[in-house]
Amino acid sequence: IGYMKGGGKALWKDENLADSITTHALDFIKANKDKPFFMYFATNDVHVPRFPHDRFRGKNPMGLRGDAIVQFDWSVGQILDELDRLGLRENTLIILSSDNGPVVDDGYADQAEELLGDHKPGGPLRGGKYSAFEAGTRIPAIASWPKEIKKGQVSDALMSQVDWFASLAALTGSVLPKGAAPDSYNYLGTLLGTDNADRPWVIEQASDHTLSVRTKDWKYIETSNGPKMVPWGP
């Protein structure tokens, strides 16, 4: 997936990706520990192709997909440990999320589906990645900030990742330029757990361009008679 720019000097080993980006993340945190910073940690786990490092192989009964999840857990743990070591954990906002719902068989022969067992990545929800149904568009979102967020809270408020732009701008006291991010709304209180305000609606789009509208209690998916964009999509 993707390409390498720079010829042979740019070659990388997939098995080393997690180590590499985690090391860069830790170096960034150490270099900026004395001032406010923003870090976006875009891991390749558990995306295909799944090539966890050898030390994580066989750690999970779900095969390479499960091992990649273990590797991702390690990466997150390394970052949290570094924040603790530097005394930054208490006053650091961490948001963990995904950009789409789950997919198991993504066209790679890695036995992800065969070894899944009774586990259902989308839970009781219908569909998955590529789909307009809930398992495709509803995603996990975890926020941690020991100094400001009371731990153990669970919210069923309707919010979109689009809203993080305006919400984090409000948190940092930033004034957005006129016309910037017009679809983003400030739901900082919802993110921090100080209230449970809902977005009135969210517009969603599947990979075949099917549009849907999600409100607090209802979802409308426009009818579509076209072919599936990918043969393995729900």
Regions found by a protein language model. Give the residues of each.
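Formylglycine-dependent
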Residues: 1-36, 43-52, 225-227
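Loop/turn elements at helix/coil->beta-strand transitions in domains of secreted/extracellular proteins
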Residues: 32-39, 88-94, 137-139, 196-200, ...
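A structural signal for well-ordered alpha-helical segments within the folded catalytic domains
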Residues: 19-23, 70-77, 159-166, 182-185
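Metal-dependent active-site segment of extracytoplasmic phospho-/sulfohydrolases and closely related
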Residues: 72-109
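The substrate-binding groove and active-site-proximal loops of carbohydrate-active enzymes
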Residues: 7-19, 58-71
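C-terminal cap/loop subdomain of S1 sulfatases and analogous C-terminal strand-loop tails that border
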Residues: 102-134, 148-153, 157-234
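Short glycine/proline-rich turn/loop motifs
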Residues: 2-10, 54-59, 144-149
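Active-site His/acidic residue clusters
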Residues: 25-67, 103-105, 109-112
